[in-house]
Amino acid sequence: MAKGKDVRLVITLECTNCSQNPNKRFSGISRYTTSKNRRNTTNRLELKKFCPQCSVHTIHKEIKK
């Protein structure tokens, strides 16, 4: 049986460049879902991932649900 809250959280990462870029291929904002360990990573997660709307690798930041 598990005690307390789960350590792993499911989070959403959103592209920081999509809202500022007028030369996008598609409309919308790129979002990825992933999980993080609450004990090891307490601050907000930032990863460099590919954005299909911008067609480049950009920084994706964790957003609130």
UniProtKB/Swiss-Prot annotation:
Compartments where located: Plastid, Chloroplast
Keywords, alphabetical: Chloroplast, Plastid, Ribonucleoprotein, Ribosomal protein
Gene3D superfamilies xref list: Ribosomal protein L33
Gene Ontology cellular component list: chloroplast; ribonucleoprotein complex; ribosome
Broad class of where this protein is predominantly found: plastid
Molecular function per GO: structural constituent of ribosome
Keyword Ion transport: no
Pfam families linked to this entry: Ribosomal_L33 (PF00471)
GO BP of this protein: translation
Family the UniProt entry places it in: Belongs to the bacterial ribosomal protein bL33 family.
NCBIfam families listed in its UniProt record: PRK00504.1, PRK00595.1, rpmG_bact
UniProt protein name: Large ribosomal subunit protein bL33c
Native species: Chaetosphaeridium globosum
Gene name tied to this protein: rpl33
